[in-house]
Amino acid sequence: MTDKQLDTKLVNAGRSKKYTLGSVNSVIQRASSLVFDTVEAKKHATRNLANGELFYGRRGTLTHFSLQEAMCELEGGAGCALFPCGAAAVANTILAFVEQGDHILMTNTAYEPSQDFCSKILGKLGVTTSWFDPLIGADITQHIQPNTKVVFLESPGSITMEVHDIPSIVSAVRRVAPEAVIMIDNTWAAGVLFKALEFDIDISIQAGTKYLIGHSDAMVGTAVANARCWEQLRENAYLMGQMLDADTAYMTSRGLRTLGVRLRQHQESSLKIAAWLANHPQVARVNHPALPGSKGHAFWKRDFTGSSGLFSFVLNKKLTEAELSAYLDNFSLFSMAYSWGGYESLIIANQPEQIAAIRPAGGVDFTGTLVRVHIGLESVDDLIADLAAGFARIV
């Protein structure tokens, strides 16, 4: 059997006997020093230190190699770099491909810390960044400069959930700037609902903190690269001291085993709740990529194989501070917290001017309070009842 279905891949990826040593899961190998029995063994390890050979703890142990192999199998990459969090994955992946005088082109709906890294850190190092509308499509060529080295996508966009026309964007970039490295924050799709490298994207980045871990109790970042970019990414990450502890690598691998079934439930529940919200009189708009009418829905339908549980909706009015507190402080099932991707439902709200402030060279087209929710694994009926009670508090 060569063409395995996703669930089968998730259960088995990275579980070869060299990593499990007779157990079901990969072993947890914690190490800094790794011992060589002979001079020849040390020479062999040195020659193969970048190819899954035990050399030094910062290069990885069996636990890391198991996860890296699994991620490459799932996303179709030549190699996978591991980082202590998603922000580290984004920052170090971008940094690997730019130098003084270069230009980055980034969607203006990218995660705010990704924007800040470019403007506040790389800006001081002589790297410039400009921004494009997430729905720009082939017109992205208008923003490409002779020194554009990185094109950074995030689809769906952070908070407002716009989906790119990725084939049009990639084709346009390849035509005008064939050497530019195209990378994507692929966290919403968990790297498996959108197969970025199959769309000629060079690097797929995830905050594995979200769906890969799946329980809101650890942080990890991954970057899966194609053959063109893997060696440069790998060595830059190593030289920057980027690494992941063995225990978190193990927890990430363990999270993969249930990722398929969790994502299906997140999708089913979030779509039911999104449809309920779309018909609620206090809701002006629902931003759910899998919901008809959401920005870029046709692109999601064409390019993605499913949906996760994160989306947002806009209220008919802008809540006052008192209303905001009454609304958010009294949910019984929705917890107010950043991040997402765990088994629990989360909620957080932003005023339109707050979103506009993190949309460089853009703005917002709504005036009501925006509410972002992550739909967890609780009963849909119970979650709807909790949301209904929230609406009753702000009538």
Curated annotation (Swiss-Prot):
Predominant subcellular localization, coarse grouping: cytoplasm
Cofactor: pyridoxal 5'-phosphate
GO-annotated molecular function: cysteine-S-conjugate beta-lyase activity; pyridoxal phosphate binding
Gene Ontology biological process terms in this record: L-cysteine catabolic process to pyruvate; methionine biosynthetic process; transsulfuration
InterPro entries to which the protein is assigned, alphabetical: Cys/Met-Metab_PyrdxlP-dep_enz (IPR000277), Cys_b_lyase_bac (IPR006233), Cys_met_metab_PP (IPR054542), PyrdxlP-dep_Trfase (IPR015424), PyrdxlP-dep_Trfase_major (IPR015421), PyrdxlP-dep_Trfase_small (IPR015422)
Catalysed reactions listed for this entry: L,L-cystathionine + H2O = L-homocysteine + pyruvate + NH4(+); an S-substituted L-cysteine + H2O = a thiol + pyruvate + NH4(+)
Enzyme class: lyase
Entry EC no(s): 4.4.1.13
CDD domains: CGS_like
Keywords: Amino-acid biosynthesis, Cytoplasm, Lyase, Methionine biosynthesis, Pyridoxal phosphate
Keyword Amino-acid biosynthesis: yes
Positions carrying N6-(pyridoxal phosphate)lysine: K210
PROSITE patterns, A to Z: CYS_MET_METAB_PP
GO cellular component: cytoplasm
Cellular compartment(s): Cytoplasm
Pfam families: Cys_Met_Meta_PP (PF01053)
Pathway listed: Amino-acid biosynthesis; L-methionine biosynthesis via de novo pathway; L-homocysteine from L-cystathionine: step 1/1
Summary of the function given for this chain in its UniProt record: Catalyzes the cleavage of cystathionine to homocysteine, pyruvate and ammonia during methionine biosynthesis.
NCBIfam families for this protein: cysta_beta_ly_B, PRK08114.1
Subunit structure and binding partners: Homotetramer.
Similarity comment: family membership: Belongs to the trans-sulfuration enzymes family.
Record's protein name: Cystathionine beta-lyase
Taxonomic source organism: Salmonella typhimurium (strain LT2 / SGSC1412 / ATCC 700720)
Taxon lineage: Bacteria, Pseudomonadati, Pseudomonadota, Gammaproteobacteria, Enterobacterales
